A protein has these predicted regions:
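Serine-dependent carboxylesterase/thioesterase catalytic core
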Residues: 4-6, 10-12, 25-27, 33, ...
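The serine-hydrolase catalytic nucleophile loop
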Residues: 12-21
Length: 93
């Protein structure tokens, strides 16, 4: 099944609005895009928030993480719905 859902995870000292210029471009290509709004209170909290976003998607998900978001997608990436991880200037395993 092709991936049609993309979940974007922002880095530290940022929020989901950092993806505002990217989201319409991906949507124009036919993707359903969600920008996670992490609290940045702890890694565990941010992973839980990202996992909730994954659970709301109706099929395979591509996770995209910027900066600290790379750590978050690495932890959340073990979900069976996740088809791949994209690291954008991110901390990778």
């Amino acid at each position: 099944m092709p991936v049609k859902n993309i979940v974007l995870v922002h880095g530290a000292w940022a929020d989901g609005s950092n993806w505002l210029k990217v989201i319409p471009k991906l949507e124009a290509l036919g993707f359903h895009v969600t920008a996670v709004q992490n609290t940045l209170t702890s890694l565990a909290d941010d992973v839980a928030t990202t996992r909730r976003a994954i659970a709301l998607e109706d099929g395979p998900v591509l996770l995209v993480g910027h900066s600290y978001g790379g750590v978050v997608i690495t932890e959340a990436g073990d979900d069976s719905k996740v088809s791949g991880l994209v690291y954008v200037a991110a901390f990778a395993p």
